[in-house]
């Protein structure tokens, strides 16, 4: 207590020199200590909010009493990710959060439609269709023949997406039709507080703009069937039909009739259905004579979805329902991410696969170029792609031409020479050993939580890792005493894949597949380790800084 209160006194004196009469005082009747101000208490101190913020940053470590966890768990990088994850309710929001990080670090936006003027010491990023981003920094000593070092991840996660015609109803309940996206663990989406997030096309005075939408309130739910009505579910397993059993409930059917009492509240920030809700929303289904093409689109669109739902979207975007032209929306879990475990050593949240690697890759490059860029020889890149969970074959996916297009514009003269000296790091989450299912892992390749980044290897090239691509990463880890783990799948289990193999084949650049180990992959809520986030961020940051030196140490020619 005395040590802590001395810190308070030192801090308060520092931020407010005139208020120097804070002192540690021991009471006469007990051994307790307290901070005794002469003029003002801490509660009334003018810098109270600053004080709280400072304390959070100063005490953002959790000292583990467990001897097995001898080092301090610095949760700062994990807390930064929690904020990133909370704001990334869809792939579009995740891309926008990456843009925010890059802008804050001084990166300049480029547009594919325009000419580029790339200069040494420059930091740039380019976004494609709001769902994929490539950022790069040009070293001050860079030449067209210099090596490239890049880390790549994906922003999408398995989820439920709204159908083009979502309007459904059953048993006097309004429902929204959904499609399953990727290989999600369907049963984990039941009995969750769900909402929608994505992007909406809005007609703003004749110009159609794409606007991000995230309804933070839980407005959807997929209820489980009571065990009394399905007695064999515990013995035969829960096998939901993804077409009929996973249809979320939006509201009672009364809402679509403009029932005046629904949504009524004294809170000005909470959505209220208008008294003429049905008329207000349905009126946009009739295009007036002489309507513009956008207005006609909106009129056609409005009949495909519940009017009450469109009213809620309009409320969030501060527009009218008749101005909504189209949307692309995911269903997401509204429960915030959190630190979990006795020592706050676990991160739990939605979409860790692969928002966590997207965050680590982006932060690692940003931190690597904050100083010393002028002496760098390398071209450093980070790429976040869409549609990995469904094969990556799209304009915003890693199997598209986005990366090749960017590389060609950066280096139109000597790309083959540079590629031969370069390294890609494909970063996608890995499977941590589950204590309840240890037999699922190969006996000698069991990545553990809190034991470091995982290098994935597959003899059939489902992963791109090979001897020449692994070596620089392993050398960097050894130099900085950063742990690495190895993973191969059991021979009697099918092996997954990610973007590494396709990127390596398309660009001819050696690639290593890595990932932070996690539990519950493709669940609505996943788990990873704080220490793995720390060590992975440190490793990739150092690899960015030192790859040009490592590259010169290897000769793979015959």
Listing of model-derived features with the role each one plays in the protein:
Residues 1-4, 414-415:
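Short intrinsically disordered, low-complexity coil segments enriched in acidic
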Residues 34, 45-558:
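N-terminal hydrophobic/helix-forming segments and targeting peptides
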Residues 4-7, 11, 22, 51, ...:
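Aromatic (phenylalanine/tyrosine) cluster motif
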Residues 2, 17, 31-33:
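Short hydrophobic alpha-helical segments enriched in small aliphatic residues
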Residues 6, 15, 26-30, 40:
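Polybasic, lysine-rich low-complexity intrinsically disordered segments
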Residues 19-24, 31, 38, 62, ...:
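Acidic, Ala/Val/Gly-enriched low-complexity intrinsically disordered segments
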């Amino acid at each position: 207590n005395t040590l802590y209160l001395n810190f308070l006194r030192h801090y308060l004196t520092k931020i407010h020199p005139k208020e120097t009469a804070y002192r540690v005082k021991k009471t006469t009747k007990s051994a307790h200590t307290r901070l005794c101000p002469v003029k003002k208490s801490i509660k009334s101190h003018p810098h109270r909010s600053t004080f709280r913020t400072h304390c959070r940053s100063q005490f953002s470590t959790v000292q583990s009493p467990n001897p097995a966890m001898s080092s301090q768990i610095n949760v700062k990088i994990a807390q930064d990710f929690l904020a990133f994850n909370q704001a990334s309710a869809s792939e579009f929001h995740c891309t926008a959060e990456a843009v925010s990080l890059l802008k804050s670090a001084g990166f300049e936006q480029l547009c594919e439609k325009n000419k580029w003027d790339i200069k040494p010491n420059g930091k740039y990023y380019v976004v494609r269709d709001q769902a994929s981003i490539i950022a790069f920094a040009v070293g001050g000593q860079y030449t067209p023949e210099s090596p490239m070092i890049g880390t790549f991840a994906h922003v999408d996660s398995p989820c439920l997406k709204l159908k083009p015609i979502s309007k459904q109803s059953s048993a006097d309940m309004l429902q929204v039709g959904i499609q399953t996206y990727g290989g999600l663990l369907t049963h984990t989406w039941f009995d969750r507080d769900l909402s929608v997030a994505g992007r909406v096309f809005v007609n703003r005075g004749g110009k159609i703009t794409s606007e991000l939408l995230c309804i933070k309130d839980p407005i959807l739910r997929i209820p489980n069937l009571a065990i009394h009505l399905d007695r064999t579910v515990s013995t035969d397993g829960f096998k939901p039909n993804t077409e009929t059993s996973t249809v979320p409930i939006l509201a009672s059917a009364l809402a679509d009739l403009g029932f005046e009492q629904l949504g009524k509240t004294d809170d000005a920030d909470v959505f209220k259905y208008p008294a003429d809700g049905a008329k207000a929303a349905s009126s946009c289904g009739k295009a007036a004579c002489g309507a513009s093409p956008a207005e006609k689109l909106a009129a056609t669109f409005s009949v495909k979805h519940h009017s009450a739902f469109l009213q809620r979207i309009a409320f969030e975007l501060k527009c009218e329902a008749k101005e909504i032209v189209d949307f692309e929306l995911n269903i997401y879990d509204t429960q915030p991410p959190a630190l979990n475990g006795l020592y706050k050593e676990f991160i739990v949240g939605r979409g860790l696969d692969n928002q966590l690697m997207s965050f680590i890759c982006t932060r690692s490059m940003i931190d690597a170029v904050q100083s010393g860029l002028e002496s760098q020889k390398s071209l450093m890149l980070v790429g976040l792609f869409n549609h990995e969970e469904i094969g990556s074959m799209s304009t915003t996916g890693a199997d598209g031409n986005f990366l090749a297009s960017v590389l060609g514009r950066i280096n139109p003269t000597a790309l083959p020479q540079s590629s031969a000296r370069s390294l890609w790091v494909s970063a996608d989450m890995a499977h941590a050993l589950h204590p309840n299912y240890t037999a699922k892992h190969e006996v000698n390749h069991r990545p553990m939580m809190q034991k470091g980044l995982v290098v994935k290897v597959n003899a059939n090239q489902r992963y791109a890792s090979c001897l020449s691509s692994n070596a620089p990463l392993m050398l960097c880890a050894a130099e900085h005493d950063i742990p690495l783990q190895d993973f191969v799948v059991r021979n009697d289990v099918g092996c997954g894949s990610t973007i590494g193999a396709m990127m390596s084949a398309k660009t001819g650049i050696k690639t290593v597949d890595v990932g932070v180990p996690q539990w519950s992959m493709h669940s609505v809520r996943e788990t990873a380790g704080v220490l793995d986030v720390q060590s992975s961020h440190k490793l990739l940051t150092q690899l960015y800084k030192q790859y040009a030196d490592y590259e010169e140490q290897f000769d793979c020619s015959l």
